[in-house]
Amino acid sequence: MSPRFSFVRALASNRHKSEDAAEVFERGETLILVLADGAGGMRGGAIASGAMVAAVRAAVTDPVFAVEDVQYWVDLFRVVDAALAKNMVGETTGVVVVLGSRKLIGVSTGDSEAWVLRATEVDDLTRGQQTKQRLGRGRVEPVVFERAALSGTLVVATDGLFKHAALDVIAHIVRASAIRIAAEELVDLVRLRSGTLADDVALVLVAAAPTSSHDE
């Protein structure tokens, strides 16, 4: 695990096979996370989100791929978009965030979101993205973002969280608890009274403190 960051990943679904996917990778002291939400109710949604994760995994393991150059990620999004459109296997949102020692960069498209929560503010990294434009339509124009090194807690999640919970409640939970506990509470937050979920949920929380990481 990178000594600079701690992270937790949580996935929840009513179904045997979720259409949401999230993974965290490391290259040296750089953390790379990807999150994808296959188009709900469409054939191949899980295949599409899985293809996005697989493309990022391949990029991270390719020594030629410059993970801290945002243009490389823009190009990757376009390659995935074209491949999914050609094969007609489904559509997916996509968020990639790269956390290095000096900066945070990322690329996104669709309605999954990435925020940085600090003590008194919320920085919506994905503000301005094309929420209706998913990978697999063959015309993606991803939004890019760049910030200084992470200060606060990074929250990246699908609309299974953001569509069903208020910003101020999400922020309160993240600020009040360690990230492992916060991840569990965020999933519980969007459960219905029956205990089921209105939608699949995938989320990743990252903090700058070097504590242990967990997968839920």
Task: Tell where the protein language model's regions lie, with residue ranges.
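PP2C/PPM-type serine/threonine phosphatase catalytic domain
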Residues: 1-216
